[in-house]
Regions:
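Surface-exposed patches in mature extracellular/periplasmic domains of secreted proteins
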Residues: 38-53, 126, 131-137, 168-170, ...
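Acidic/histidine-rich, surface-exposed loop or edge segments in extracytoplasmic proteins
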Residues: 4-22, 95-101
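Extracytoplasmic
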Residues: 8, 45-47, 87
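Zn2+-dependent metallopeptidase catalytic core
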Residues: 18-72, 106, 113, 120, ...
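Pan-zinc metallopeptidase signature
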Residues: 178-250
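Zinc-dependent metallopeptidase catalytic helix centered on the HExxH motif
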Residues: 73-167
Length: 250
């Protein structure tokens, strides 16, 4: 297998030689995301490396947390685990692999192809929020697992994946049990963005971004309660379940 490198102004990508065109498209998408996210979150001070893998096995070898996250995720959301962010690099599956992973439901392919941006958002939030990875710091992985809905959710929401997740959310609600609030780690990939979407619709985009940039509270429910000041947790949960039902029914 021959590897090649493609560069843009702020990113570099290592990929199989045959993926050069797709790699250039990924970097173009990331450059646009960098510009759009510079105001609300900021930008890395250094170039971000992107490693594009042609198979999940290669990604798992490079990022051992990837297969663990896959095993934890609910079946409806596993196909959308498309990569893993580091402090200054993003590992992701190639666009061709992501296209093959897409299901037949509307929005599945679109959600998968936005995965590079979602991972970049997670990288940015880890840069700004020392309590969460990336990079992995003492205690941060434990906090991230407990708050996986927030880590995955901010990436899903800011990348634009949430609007495309609606059919997958509907499947999750049909086939799985009643989801926890906030979503459990198994549901983070699919349902995490819905919490941020609700918060933005009620308190504005700035409130949703701020939630991801502040150290989480001791428990996930306390973190959510802090984002909706003055409202009982049961009321916020009810609003979220109604919002989730609307997303699933759209």
């Amino acid at each position: 297998m021959a590897w090649a490198e493609t560069r843009s102004e702020h990113f570099s990508a290592r990929h199989e030689e045959r993926e050069s065109r797709q790699a250039a498209e990924v970097l173009e998408m990331l450059e646009q995301a960098r510009e759009e996210l510079s105001a609300p979150i900021g930008t890395p001070g250094e170039e971000v490396a992107v490693v594009i893998h042609g198979a999940a096995a290669g990604l798992a070898l490079a990022q051992p947390a990837f297969p663990v996250a896959y095993a934890v995720s609910a079946p409806a959301g596993r196909r959308y685990l498309a990569g893993w962010p580091g402090a200054r690099e993003i590992h992701l599956l190639s666009p061709a692999v992501l296209a093959r992973r897409a299901s037949g439901v509307p929005g599945s392919l679109e959600m998968l192809l936005l995965a590079p941006v979602a991972l970049y958002v997670q990288l940015l939030c880890g840069m700004r929020n020392p309590a969460l990875p990336p990079p992995a710091r003492p205690g941060s992985l434990r906090v991230a697992f407990r708050n996986a809905w927030l880590v995955a959710g901010i990436g899903q929401w800011l990348s634009g994946q949430t609007v495309h997740a609606r059919p997958a959310i509907a499947r999750r609600l049909r086939e799985g049990g009643r989801p926890a609030f906030p979503p459990a780690p198994s549901d983070a990939l699919l349902l995490g963005g819905s919490v941020l979407d609700l918060l933005a619709s009620e308190n504005g985009r700035e409130a949703a971004v701020a939630l991801a940039l502040e150290p989480p509270a001791p428990t996930p429910r306390e973190t959510v309660a802090r984002a909706f000041p003055g409202r009982p947790a049961t009321e916020v949960e009810g609003a979220w379940r109604s919002h989730l039902a609307r997303l699933a029914g759209s």
